[in-house]
């Protein structure tokens, strides 16, 4: 890959897998502990002369390492091909020598690692080329069959954690393979930079039919299933094997099928019923079972996923088509209205509305807040009524956000909610600008048309906000490249943010329950009022995300600063003996089980959002061979359920620890950890709140653990030693005083305004110490002078005495 081309996300993931594989090859050793990789890494001759067809291929592991560093591999099969040809040349070089057996052993190790990577889901199904065959040295480079090439060569996904990777089935629809071949690959087989930019994942701006929405829900649930160890079972079924490297598969299977083929057929609307979609899934699993040995892991996974698919279908069969847009799909158009006559424009109040125009749709829930929308399609129904398919843009008060969130004035958020409205529901025009243009000017000729600013998307499923990176990707295809004239400001304006418009919904103790309200079937599923969530703490991220399945309490709702409780005063509390733990725990339980303020949760928005964000129906749990798990209903007393907030106050209590030999039921692949298949998820099935041992016991607040015989020095009022209690402050009733904070007024220093001096004792000590030092120094000097004088006398006497 050219250094000027920025590697894609798939190329980076592939590079990590290749590095991991290459490290295992370099670490391979023989029985004596000697590394085997130098045999193929330090070839002493040009191995390209041995195999003429290997011109341009790496001749050492170092050259393969260089190709990995430069992102020249777009598919794992290319790496396998180069590594296989490297072994062909090295074996030809050492043929007839003792080294040949070591090279062959290293090749077998690579084949074994290839199978391990496939079983772990890192790579698709790839076979090692037959390097012993003479035709192996003359075969062409590996490439996919155009009939099944639904993705470019670098489109392979190496799914170790499918949740981290994106779900391509919920985004851009796939193009024809021949179109991709022309647009994505040049003559040299490398990708152009502009094509790589176009491959960047962007949400689809096309509304989905009810069949597509239902199919994608089923596809996602089956695809994301994981066993107890976290392994993704669906990884081998993502793509078809390479026909050049695995021709026997296509000889044995008459109708090859994989997820890539199903996705292509679904995006091209080849399925007329959901049964046809399910038949292809069953065909894919049946092919895997017929081709693989019954004892293989792929066979067991295919059999399990087929049964799991049947249970998912039973769970989804009872749902209406209108339910699927709420939590699994990004868009929806009304399927019950046939769109027979597609029109380029429609006239309303003497003006023409075209695709891409911004309009305000009547909002039956709040007529003062019409729905900001953009037209994606104009059509006429069978009863000769003009309709428009629009994409909704929600206002801040129509979203679920934290109480400390701030927004721009006139800000709206793009959603993936698509609706069909009669033209008669359009109440006027509007205009939405991206923030980079909004601060620079206004569109020309809009007059009094309201203008809104947009910077982020809003996910109605996860209640998350995310910044928009490409405004053109948010536009309909008909107007994605068009521009409009602007009247620029003298200088860019500075936008200010305002507080949440829902702060007035914060409940008070005197506020009663609001009366329920009904809305129109085609109105805002999130109408005039949004919902407030707890403000983010310092340790939390800046995201507005929240899980609707997390229960909220009155302690979690944000409180304005003016009404926040005052800090505790420095008042003593008495260390009195409490009656029993049950009274304290019941009081705490009553406090923690307070109901959520009804103004935030009983509004129409919360009734709808609670339904739409409820957890997906529980996936059935299966006990697979080799990974059986005991479904024990016993819960450890110290286990915390993931649905409870970590900020809850847990009352003190005595603990009786009991050993449990059973394991908890559930699987990582099972959403709710159901005890039996088809068990629905319910809040009541959650374990009770845990009780922890206290880090320390405040004296006087607990009973003695042993009531049989009092311990000497311990009275019935406190649990501290009486000798220690005598040293503590007490009131007139001889009750020990316990302060909540340290004292504010320490003992003042004497002579605060005077100069600080040493004490008399210290001064006398320094004087005596100094005089002692002086005396010792004088004595040392006197001895030194005497020694010098004696030396001088001795030298003079020696000089005067004749020899």
UniProtKB/Swiss-Prot annotation:
Q: Name one GO molecular function term.
A: chromatin binding
Task: Specify the Bromo domain's residue ranges.
Answer: 9-117, 206-316
UniProt record similarity statement:
Belongs to the RSC1 family.
GO terms for biological process, alphabetical: chromatin remodeling; transcription elongation by RNA polymerase II; transcription initiation-coupled chromatin remodeling
Q: Does the keyword Iron-sulfur apply?
A: no
Name the chain's protein: Chromatin structure-remodeling complex subunit rsc1
Residue limits of the BAH domain? 351-469
Lineage top rank: taxon: Eukaryota
Q: What keywords is this UniProt entry annotated with? A: Bromodomain, Chromatin regulator, Nucleus, Phosphoprotein, Repeat, Transcription, Transcription regulation
């Amino acid at each position: 890959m050219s250094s000027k081309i920025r590697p894609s996300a798939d190329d980076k993931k592939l590079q990590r897998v290749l590095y991991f594989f290459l490290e295992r090859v370099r670490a391979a050793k023989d029985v004596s502990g000697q590394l085997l990789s130098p045999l193929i890494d330090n070839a002493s001759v040009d191995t390209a002369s041995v195999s003429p067809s290997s011109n341009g291929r790496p001749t050492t592991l170092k050259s393969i390492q260089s190709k990995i560093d430069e992102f020249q591999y777009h598919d794992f099969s290319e790496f396998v091909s180069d590594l296989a040809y490297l072994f062909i040349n090295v074996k030809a070089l050492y043929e007839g020598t003792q080294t040949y057996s070591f090279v062959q052993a290293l090749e077998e190790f690579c084949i074994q690692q290839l199978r391990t990577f496939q079983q772990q889901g890192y790579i698709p199904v790839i076979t090692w080329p037959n390097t012993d065959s003479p035709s192996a040295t003359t075969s062409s480079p590996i490439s996919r069959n155009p009939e099944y090439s639904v993705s470019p060569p670098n489109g392979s996904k190496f799914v170790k954690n499918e949740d981290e990777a994106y779900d391509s089935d919920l985004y851009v629809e796939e193009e024809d393979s021949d179109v991709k071949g022309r647009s994505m690959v040049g003559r040299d087989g490398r990708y152009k930079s502009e094509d790589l930019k176009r491959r960047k994942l962007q949400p689809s701006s096309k509304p989905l039919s009810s069949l597509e929405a239902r199919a994608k829900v089923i596809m996602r649930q089956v695809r994301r299933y994981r066993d107890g160890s976290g392994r993704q079972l669906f990884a081998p079924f993502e793509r078809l094997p390479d026909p050049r490297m695995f021709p026997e598969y296509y000889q044995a299977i008459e109708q090859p099928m994989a997820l890539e083929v199903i996705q292509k057929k679904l995006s091209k609307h080849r399925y007329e019923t959901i049964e046809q979609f399910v038949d292809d899934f069953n065909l894919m699993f049946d092919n895997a079972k017929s081709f693989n040995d019954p004892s293989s892991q792929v066979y067991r996974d295919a059999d399990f996923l087929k049964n799991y698919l049947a249970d998912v279908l039973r769970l989804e069969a009872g749902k209406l088509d209108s339910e699927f847009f709420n939590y699994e799909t990004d868009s929806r158009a009304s399927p019950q209205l046939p769109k027979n006559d597609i029109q380029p424009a429609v006239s309303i109040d003497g003006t023409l509305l075209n695709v891409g125009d911004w309009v305000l749709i009547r909002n039956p829930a709040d007529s003062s807040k019409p729905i900001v929308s953009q037209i994606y399609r104009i059509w006429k129904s069978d009863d000769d009524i003009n309709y428009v398919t629009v994409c909704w843009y929600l206002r801040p008060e129509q979203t679920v956000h934290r109480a400390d969130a701030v927004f721009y004035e006139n800000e709206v958020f793009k959603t993936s909610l698509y609706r069909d409205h009669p033209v008669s529901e359009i109440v006027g025009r509007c205009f939405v600008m991206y923030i980079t243009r909004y601060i620079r000017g206004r569109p020309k000729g809009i007059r009094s048309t309201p203008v809104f600013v947009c910077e982020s998307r809003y996910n109605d499923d996860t209640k998350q906000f995310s910044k928009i990176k490409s405004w053109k990707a948010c536009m309909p295809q008909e107007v994605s490249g068009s521009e409009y004239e602007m009247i620029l400001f003298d200088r860019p304006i500075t936008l200010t943010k305002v507080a949440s418009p829902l702060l007035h919904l914060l409940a008070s103790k005197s506020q009663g329950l609001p009366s329920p309200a009904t809305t129109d079937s085609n109105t805002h599923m999130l109408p005039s009022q949004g919902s407030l969530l707890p403000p983010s703490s310092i340790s939390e991220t800046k995201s507005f995300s929240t899980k609707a399945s997390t229960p909220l309490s009155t302690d979690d709702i944000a409180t304005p600063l003016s009404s926040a409780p005052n800090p505790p005063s420095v008042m003593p509390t008495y260390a009195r003996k409490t009656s029993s733990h049950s009274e304290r725990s019941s009081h705490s339980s009553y406090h923690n089980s307070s109901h959520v303020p009804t103004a935030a949760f009983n509004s129409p928005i919360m009734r709808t959002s609670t339904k739409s964000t409820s957890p997906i129906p529980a996936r059935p749990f299966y006990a697979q061979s080799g990974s059986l798990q005991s479904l024990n209903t016993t819960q450890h007393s110290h286990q915390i359920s993931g649905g409870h907030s970590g900020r809850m106050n847990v009352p003190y209590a005595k603990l009786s620890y009991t050993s449990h030999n059973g394991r908890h039921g559930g699987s990582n692949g099972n959403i709710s950890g159901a005890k039996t298949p088809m068990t629905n998820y319910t809040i009541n099935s959650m374990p009770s709140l845990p009780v922890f041992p206290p880090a320390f016991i405040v004296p006087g607040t607990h009973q003695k653990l042993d009531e049989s015989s009092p311990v000497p020095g311990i009275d019935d009022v406190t649990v501290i030693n009486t000798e220690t209690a005598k040293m503590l402050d007490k009131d007139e009733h001889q009750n020990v005083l316990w302060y909540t904070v340290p004292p504010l007024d320490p003992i003042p220093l004497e002579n605060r305004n005077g100069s600080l001096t040493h004490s008399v004792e210290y001064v006398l000590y320094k004087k005596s110490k100094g005089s002692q030092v002086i005396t010792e120094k004088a004595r040392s000097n006197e001895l030194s002078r005497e020694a010098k004088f004696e030396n001088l006398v001795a030298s003079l006497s020696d000089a005067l005495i004749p020899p």
